[in-house]
């Protein structure tokens, strides 16, 4: 029989992997497919969580909170992509500086409205049954996070590789001018992708705010972890993001249980090794 501590550590790692995938999947869409350096993605996660918290305070309906957080950040993403990023498209330095500045504004706005103390969204009872699994009792909401991440991964894969919309997106990444010449409005298409990226970050913020807590500063932590996931898996690869999230989540869980002082720094070890051996990531491709 497996040691209960090891079972708990593995399950916690899978839960963290699920949350990281929800965040990183949005980042890999913006960073990998659109070549947009969106370093405000962590701030999207943070603000989405607090918007969901506000909706939950009013409605007490968790699904509305998740939808409100996602849609609210999708609107913020629309503003950012069409008003701010459109004018500096392709200039990576300008995109980096702009998104860093935008994330700082969001963090300060959150601090002004909700304060600096940690807040969390109440877990609904119907999403949090006590589940007996492999000899231990485990919170059902953590398993829900894992299930949700699997559903999102499958949905993204179907959209990108089994639909005409996905074919247009991938063609637009490879040759924007050719797709535009075919009469496809590539600008609107990429705006839609960026809004989806923001929606995923906002929804992940509500999930993370229910699983853990929300506080200014968590945006930077999860931005860094999402970047690690995307770099390990390969930019633009949903499957790579899933592998990167799984690896990072398990490392965070095991290092937190056995080497707590080194927990965060150890997550960078596989990224360094993979960058040295395969700079494009496990499932990524070279970007010219």
Q: Which residue ranges define each predicted feature?
A:
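Transmembrane alpha-helical segments in multi-pass inner-membrane proteins
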Residues: 20, 24, 61-71, 191-201, ...
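Membrane-interfacial amphipathic/re-entrant helices at transmembrane-helix boundaries
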Residues: 1-22, 51, 59-64, 91-96, ...
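Helix-loop-helix "hairpin" substructures at the membrane interface of multi-pass membrane proteins
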Residues: 16, 22, 137-214, 238-243
């Amino acid at each position: 029989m497996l040691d209960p501590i090891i079972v708990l550590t593995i399950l916690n790692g899978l839960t963290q992997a699920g949350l990281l995938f929800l965040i990183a999947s949005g980042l890999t869409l913006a960073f990998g497919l659109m070549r947009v350096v969106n370093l405000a993605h962590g701030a999207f996660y943070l603000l989405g969580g607090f918007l969901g918290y506000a909706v939950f305070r009013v409605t007490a309906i968790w699904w509305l909170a998740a939808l409100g957080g996602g849609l609210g950040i999708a609107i913020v993403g629309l503003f950012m992509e069409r008003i701010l990023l459109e004018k500096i498209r392709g200039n990576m330095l300008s995109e980096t500086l702009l998104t860093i500045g935008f994330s700082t504004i969001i963090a300060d706005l959150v601090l002004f409205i909700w304060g600096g103390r940690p807040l969390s969204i109440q877990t609904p009872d119907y999403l949090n049954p006590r589940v007996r699994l492999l000899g231990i009792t485990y919170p059902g909401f953590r398993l829900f996070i894992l299930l949700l991440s699997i559903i999102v991964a499958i949905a993204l894969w179907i959209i990108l590789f089994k639909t005409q919309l996905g074919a247009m997106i991938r063609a637009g990444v490879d040759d924007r001018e050719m797709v535009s010449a075919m009469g496809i409005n590539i600008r609107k298409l990429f705006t839609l992708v960026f809004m989806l990226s923001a929606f995923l970050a906002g929804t992940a913020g509500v999930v993370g705010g229910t699983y853990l807590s929300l506080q200014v500063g968590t945006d930077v932590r999860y931005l860094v972890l999402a970047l690690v996931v995307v770099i390990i898996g390969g930019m633009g690869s949903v499957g790579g993001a899933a592998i990167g999230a799984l690896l990072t989540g398990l490392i965070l869980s095991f290092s937190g249980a056995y080497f707590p002082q080194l927990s965060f720094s150890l997550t960078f070890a596989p990224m360094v090794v993979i960058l040295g051996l395969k700079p494009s990531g496990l499932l990524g491709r070279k970007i010219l």
